């Protein structure tokens, strides 16, 4: 059996082009760009879909804020508002709504009673208001100590109010429901 002397053996590296070719580089870049485009398109579609849920939940939270301000007897301009706290919705302004202190006690929103204007997320609009029939405006107020819930359309109160929202990009809809007991639901 012959053993080769390993110490004196020379290893020769063949001179072959060991780099990337232009075609390989272009294919790699194409794959990376394709993966990035797929990720970004799915990400923005998911964001658009979440905007409706976010808008409806924010609206319900703002209704609860008005309810809590009434329960907590929160003052507005150094006195408790006679009509409590409320939220004003109108189809004339479909991208925002107002939290207000009903200082006059008339169950309706006046511009001098405005506490906060809340804009809806991008592409989300109020498509309708209802208290049993379609309305152009709806004021939901909470009067302590119970709090008494008043769902007022400018002429009469009702037992349930609905605010309908729509995502103008995806076409999906949601509804926020408030009843006379103060229960606020998002569907």
Identify the role of each PLM range:
Residues 81-144:
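Type IV pilin-like appendage domain
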């Amino acid at each position: 059996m012959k053993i080769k002397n390993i110490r004196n053996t020379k290893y020769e590296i063949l001179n072959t082009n060991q780099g990337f070719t232009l075609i390989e580089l272009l294919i790699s870049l194409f794959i990376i760009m394709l993966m990035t485009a797929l990720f970004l398109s799915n990400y923005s579609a998911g964001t658009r879909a979440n905007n409706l849920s976010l808008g409806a939940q924010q609206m319900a939270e703002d209704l609860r804020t008005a309810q809590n301000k009434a329960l907590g007897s929160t003052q507005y301009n150094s006195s408790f508002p006679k009509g409590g706290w409320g939220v004003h919705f109108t189809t004339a302004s479909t991208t925002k709504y107002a939290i207000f202190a009903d200082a006059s006690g008339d169950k309706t929103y006046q511009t001098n009673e405005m506490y906060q204007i809340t804009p809806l997320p991008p592409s989300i609009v109020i498509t309708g208001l209802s208290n049993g029939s379609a309305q152009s405006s709806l004021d939901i107020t909470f009067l302590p100590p119970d709090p008494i819930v008043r769902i007022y359309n400018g002429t009469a109160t009702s037992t349930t109010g609905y605010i309908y929202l729509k995502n103008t990009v995806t076409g999906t809809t949601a509804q926020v429901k408030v009843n006379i007991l103060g229960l606020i639901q998002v569907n």
